[in-house]
From Swiss-Prot:
Protein name as it appears in the record: Peptidase T
Xref: SUPFAM superfamilies: Bacterial exopeptidase dimerisation domain, Zn-dependent exopeptidases
Biological classification of the source: Bacteria, Bacillati, Bacillota, Bacilli, Bacillales
Residue sites binding Zn(2+) 2 per the record: D142, E177, H381
UniProt-listed InterPro entries: ArgE/DapE_CS, Bact_exopeptidase_dim_dom, Peptidase_M20, Peptidase_M20_dimer, Peptidase_M20B
Amino acid sequence: MKQELIERFTRYVKIDTQSNEESHTVPTTPGQIEFGKLLVEELKEIGLTEVMMDDNGYVMATLPANTDKDVPVIGFLAHLDTATDFTGKNVKPQIHENFDGNAITLNEELNVVLTPEQFPELPSYKGHTIITTDGTTLLGADDKAGLTEIMVAMNHLIHNPQIKHGKIRVAFTPDEEIGRGPAHFDVEAFGASFAYTMDGGPLGGLEYESFNAAGAKLTFNGTNTHPGTAKNKMRNATKLAMEFNGHLPVEEAPEYTEGYEGFYHLLSLNGDVEQSKAYYIVRDFDRENFEARKNNVKNIVKNMQEKYGEDAVVLEMNDQYYNMLEKIEPVREIVDIAYEAMKSLDIEPNIHPIRGGTDGSQLSYMGLPTPNIFTGGENYHGKFEYVSVDNMEKAVQVIVEIARRFEEQA
C-alpha cells in the first residue's frame, strides 16, 4: 500500500492543477480537466463502475456494495485543484525515507531549509517516509494526498472482498481552493446520504465546524497629476487602499488569531496612483459576528465614499460558504462513526474547527452533510509543505474502516 501511495501521489502532484480566481470557465484551468481525464481512466482500471466526468470537470464513480444489507450510500470526496498562494508548476516531489527528524535542506542554491525551529512538529515524523517540495513550489498535498488516499482505499476494498461494505460513491471536484468547488456539483446525481471530504491536515484531524466566509473585492479610483502641481488635485488610489486597511482592527488578522477567532485578511494589493485593487477574505465561526464583520467593511467603504466621493471606492462582496456545524449536528452519527473508526486504529481523533473551508462547507448546505478527515499533510499552500506517507496510509485505513462499520451497523 505504501508504494502505491508514493507512486500515485508523486505522479499526481506533477500535474499543474492550480485554479484561477480570475477565470470564468469551469473548471478555471485546463490542468484540472487533464487530471480529471486521467483519473477517469484509473478509476476504471481499479474496477469502479459508473465512472464519468461531466462538462464542468466533476469526476464521479461507484464502488458497488458487496453485501445484501441495506447500508446507506456514503461518499468520499477530494478536490482536483491546488492553491493559488504559491506556484504549483513543475512540482518536483522529494522522498525522504526513514526521516531522521532533523532539518531538511529543500534547496541548497536558494537556501530553503525546513527546520524544527520554524516547524516544531517536524521531529514527530522521525522514522516516517515524508515527501517534501524542492523549495521552489508548493507540493499539492492539499488535496492530492486526499485524492490519492481515496484511490488507494477503493483499490484496497476491491482486492479485499472479505471487507463488507455498502455502495460507495467517489467524487473529485474542481476549483475548491477558490471557493467554487460545489458550485456545479449535482448532489442528486451523486446519490449519497452523506459524505466525507479527505481534505484535512495532520493525523487524527476530524472536522465538522468551518468558518462562515466572504470575499471582498475593493477598487480604489484615484486622480493622477504631475506631483509638482498636484496640490488639491491628486487623489492617490494606493493611499486610499492603505487608508481602508488602516480602519481594520490590526489584531483581527490571521497572524494574530487562532481557535474560534475570526479575521480580516488582505490577500492581494496592487495598483498605482490612478487605480488600486485589493482583495480581502472575511472569516468568522459565529454567524452574527460574521455579519458584523461584513457590515464593518461596508461602513468603512461608506465613510470613505462620503469623504472622497462615491466613485473613490467600489466594493463587491459575496458570501462564499457557511459553517457546516448547523447541518452536521442533526446527523451526528456520521461524525461518531469516523471517530470510532479512528479510535479502533489507535489514532487519537483531534476534533477542532476548520480555520478555513472545504467543499463540505457548501455541500452540507446543499443537502449532503460532509465532515472532513485528515490526510497527513502539513504546511499547506507553500514551499514548506510536506506529507507523511505513513499517515496517508492511516487515512486509507480510516476510509476502509468507516465503510466497514456502516455495513456492520446496518
